[in-house]
């Protein structure tokens, strides 16, 4: 894209303005359009020239606009920015290749002003598609789709962003028009500051989300960005690099015992949802009420053909293989799910505070949420101490008491604990224990110093405990 700085009076639909006298085709009663920060323009020529310090032109000058010694910076014969950027357009004649643009005799002055870049709209309204398929617009609408003043021919415009211009014919624009087989996605009111260069009329912002109602295949984000998606890429081509969701595939590994082949093959049917897999296993493999043999034939099942007494128990067991957990916790924010309804019932008591299991020992008022906790508590009232320490043979009524006791052995050395005979490994490495037994004259500080410099031993002796 070629950027041209112009300090002279601007004419909509014409080419590059310049300093100097008005051109020969200027209409006598027309005031120059105000282009500066004043959106309403000025009636004097001096104010218009000062306001139009710079302009950002998106279309080249026409042959009618340029004099015999001038050429446009957008044409390939220009030796300025156009040739430096390598722009080549087939719309111009090759016999101007040696000409140098003069820009109205003030080429150097036209590039002296480097401030106040403004977007200007050449005109308002829509025109029919110009002949020759080389006209393209900025993202959606072409620059030539806007009317120029009466009596001045339409200039061709060029592609600014290749790759985004391909659009299949027949798609209406959000405003109900099709220009150059391209959909206009609301850029006309957003890109330019004024809707009409001749009257002080504000250009309302178009709603990009309103266009999505007319285009169900385009998302609101596509409409807002004004991107034309190529017809052969489909509506989602703009987001084709986004990661697609991974499709879940669940396989049935049930092995039918009626197979005659060896080795027997599993079902291997795949399903996209857990509901489909469970329905398939229940209906086709487990069977109905007429089935008397409730055996799990899932591949590598640890039960190895052992039968269940009831069908519901087999169904609950199959959830171990399928991973189904159909019982979620109904309390907000919990998020836990369970495979068995009994486990959900017990879990819900943690939210409600219900403790239906009372201690059966007379005089004890302790209550518990589940029967297993009550059973552990009952050992307090009886002489039964089933939790025995393997190091010192002490027994406890509750497993938590045994865990607290084991921390005592972790802090002791191998000299005072018969760890080797009890099945527990010593918390002190054998090398340290042998060194302490051989050299009894050293103080504990000396032993600590000698062991701290051994690079082959970890500083934390608890790592040796299993």
UniProtKB/Swiss-Prot annotation:
Signal peptide: none
Zinc finger (C2H2-type): 250-285, 294-321, 327-351, 357-381, 387-409
Keyword Disulfide bond belongs to the record: no
Quaternary structure, from the entry: Interacts with KPNA1 and KPNA6. Interacts (via C2H2-type domains 3, 4 and 5) with GLI3; the interaction enhances its transcriptional activity. Interacts (via the C2H2-type domains 3, 4 and 5) with MDFIC (via the C2H2-type domains 3, 4 and 5); the interaction reduces its transcriptional activity.
InterPro entries attached to this UniProt entry: GLI-like, Znf-C2H2_ZIC1-5/GLI1-3-like, Znf_C2H2_sf, Znf_C2H2_type, Znf_ZIC
GO cellular component, one term: nucleus
Compartment(s) of residence: Nucleus; Cytoplasm
Biased composition (Polar residues): 65-80, 434-454
GO MF annotations, alphabetized: DNA-binding transcription activator activity, RNA polymerase II-specific; DNA-binding transcription factor activity; RNA polymerase II cis-regulatory region sequence-specific DNA binding; RNA polymerase II transcription regulatory region sequence-specific DNA binding; sequence-specific DNA binding; transcription coactivator activity; zinc ion binding
Domain remarks: The C2H2-type 3, 4 and 5 zinc finger domains are necessary for transcription activation.
Biased composition (Low complexity): 411-427
Protein name: Zinc finger protein ZIC 3
Phenotype of gene-disrupted mutants: Some mice exhibit embryonic and postnatal lethality. Viable mice show heart disease, disturbances of laterality, neural tube defects and vertebral and rib defects.
Function: Acts as a transcriptional activator. Required in the earliest stages in both axial midline development and left-right (LR) asymmetry specification. Binds to the minimal GLI-consensus sequence 5'-GGGTGGTC-3'.
Start and end residues of each stretch annotated as Disordered: 65-103, 403-466
Family designation: Belongs to the GLI C2H2-type zinc-finger protein family.
Cross-link (Glycyl lysine isopeptide (Lys-Gly) (interchain with G-Cter in SUMO2)) at residue(s): 247
Motif (Nuclear localization signal): 296-321, 329-351
Tissues/organs with expression: CNS. A high level expression is seen in the cerebellum.
Gene Ontology BP annotations: anterior/posterior pattern specification; atrial cardiac muscle tissue development; axial mesoderm development; central nervous system segmentation; cranial skeletal system development; determination of digestive tract left/right asymmetry; determination of left/right asymmetry in nervous system; determination of left/right symmetry
Keyword tags: Activator, Cytoplasm, Developmental protein, Differentiation, DNA-binding, Isopeptide bond, Metal-binding, Neurogenesis, Nucleus, Repeat, Transcription, Transcription regulation, Ubl conjugation, Zinc, Zinc-finger
Comp. bias intervals (Basic residues): 86-97
């Amino acid at each position: 894209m070629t950027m041209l700085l112009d300090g002279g009076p601007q004419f909509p639909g014409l080419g590059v303005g310049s300093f100097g006298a008005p051109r020969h085709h200027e209409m006598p009663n027309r005031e120059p359009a105000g282009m500066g920060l004043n959106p309403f323009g000025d009636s004097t020529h001096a104010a218009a020239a000062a306001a139009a310090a710079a302009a950002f032109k998106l279309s080249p000058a026409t042959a009618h606009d340029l004099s015999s010694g001038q050429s446009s910076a957008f044409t390939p014969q220009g030796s300025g920015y156009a040739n430096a950027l390598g722009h080549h357009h087939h719309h111009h004649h090759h016999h101007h290749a040696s000409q140098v643009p003069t820009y109205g005799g003030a080429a150097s002055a036209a590039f002296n002003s480097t401030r106040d870049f403004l977007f200007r709209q050449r005109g308002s309204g829509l025109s029919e598609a110009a002949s020759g398929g080389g006209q393209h617009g900025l993202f959606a609408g072409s620059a030539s789709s806007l009317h120029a003043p009466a009596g001045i021919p339409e200039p061709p415009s060029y592609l600014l962003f290749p790759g985004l211009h391909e659009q299949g014919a027949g798609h209406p624009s959000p405003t109900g028009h099709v220009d150059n087989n391209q959909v206009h996605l609301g850029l006309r009111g957003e890109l330019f500051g004024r809707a009409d260069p001749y009257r002080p009329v504000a250009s309302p912002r178009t709603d990009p989300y309103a266009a999505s109602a007319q285009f169900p295949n385009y998302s609101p984000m596509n409409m807002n960005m004004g991107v034309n998606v190529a017809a052969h890429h489909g509506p989602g081509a703009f987001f084709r690099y986004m990661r697609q969701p991974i499709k879940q595939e669940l396989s049935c590994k049930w092995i039918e015992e009626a197979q005659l082949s060896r080795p027997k093959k599993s079902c291997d049917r795949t399903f996209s949802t857990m509901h489909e897999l469970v329905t398939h296993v229940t209906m086709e493999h487990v069977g109905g009420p007429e089935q008397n043999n409730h055996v799990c034939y899932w591949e590598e099942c640890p039960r190895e053909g052992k039968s269940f007494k009831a069908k519901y128990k087999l169904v609950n067991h199959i959830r171990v293989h399928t991973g189904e957990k159909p019982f979620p916790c109904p309390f907000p924010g919990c998020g836990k799910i369970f495979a068995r309804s009994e486990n959900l019932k017990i879990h819900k008591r943690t939210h409600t505070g219900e403790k239906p299991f009372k201690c059966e020992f007379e005089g004890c008022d302790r209550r518990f949420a589940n029967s297993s906790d009550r059973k552990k508590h009952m050992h307090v009232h009886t002489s039964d101490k089933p939790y025995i320490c393997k190091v010192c043979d002490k027994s406890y009524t509750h497993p938590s008491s045994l865990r607290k006791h084991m921390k005592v052995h972790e802090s002791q050395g191998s000299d005072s604990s018969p760890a080797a005979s009890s099945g527990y490994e010593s918390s002190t490495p054998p090398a340290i224990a042998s060194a302490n037994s051989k050299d009894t004259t050293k103080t504990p500080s000396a032993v600590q110093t000698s062991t701290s410099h051994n690079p082959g031993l970890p500083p934390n002796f608890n790592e040796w405990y299993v």
